[in-house]
């Protein structure tokens, strides 16, 4: 627990110092933002009556690994139940987008950046949600429960499962002048 508190404090200190990657390092910025965010807005195509085929966004807790500098796999893991409306959408069509933003961290508040200001970096991932296999479940569990310890006590009868966001496209908005495109290969090959 002391180690977790230290890692969280180190991550917050790095954000507070403003040690984010420079705008010309878009792949590194994408990894940095994802790793420093605890939640994101997941958008699906609704399968619900009256909303069928329309975009539907919902907030989900995420983690790519334990908090702290240099950590994280870059893979956004989620803890899901099919009782959740967005998960029901994903059972019909697993395609989704995930948006994460430094607006949820102290960084943008410290610099007085509005969440829509490009300097308050945000990343948009497109891809699909897939259940993790048994060999990856332990990694997903550790990544999620380290950041979100409350999850471990959620009702067992909800049939929770571990999933990951399988990234196919990445857009970075971290500076004025428009979006930057990062390939999944660039994203996973860069050191965060």
UniProtKB/Swiss-Prot annotation:
Residues 1-18 form the signal peptide. InterPro entries: CREG, CREG_beta-barrel, Split_barrel_FMN-bd. Gene3D superfamilies: Electron Transport, Fmn-binding Protein, Chain A (2.30.110.10). It is found in: Secreted. Its main location: secreted. Keywords: Glycoprotein, Growth regulation, Secreted, Signal. Coiled coil: none annotated. Glycans are attached at residues 95, 133, 166. Transmembrane segments: none annotated. GO terms for cellular component: cytoplasm; extracellular space; intracellular membrane-bounded organelle. May contribute to the transcriptional control of cell growth and differentiation. Belongs to the CREG family. This is Protein CREG1. The gene is CREG1.
């Amino acid at each position: 627990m002391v180690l977790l508190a230290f890692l969280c404090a180190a991550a917050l200190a790095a954000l507070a110092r403003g040690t984010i990657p420079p705008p010309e390092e878009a792949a590194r910025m994408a990894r940095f933002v994802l790793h420093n965010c605890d939640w994101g807005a997941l958008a699906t195509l609704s399968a619900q009556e009256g909303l069928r085929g329309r975009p539907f966004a919902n907030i989900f807790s995420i983690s790519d690994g334990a908090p702290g500098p240099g950590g994280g796999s870059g893979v956004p893991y989620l803890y899901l139940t099919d009782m959740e409306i967005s998960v029901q959408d994903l059972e019909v069509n697993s395609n989704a987008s995930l948006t994460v933003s430094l607006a949820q961290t102290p960084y943008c508040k410290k610099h007085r950046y509005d969440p829509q200001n490009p300097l308050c970096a945000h990343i948009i991932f497109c891809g699909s949600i897939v259940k993790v296999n048994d060999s990856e479940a332990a990694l997903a569990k550790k990544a999620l429960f380290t950041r979100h310890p409350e999850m471990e006590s959620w009702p067992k009868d909800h049939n929770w499962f571990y999933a990951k966001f399988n990234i196919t496209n990445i857009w970075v908005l971290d500076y004025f002048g428009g979006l930057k495109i990062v390939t999944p290969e660039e994203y996973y090959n860069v050191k965060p």
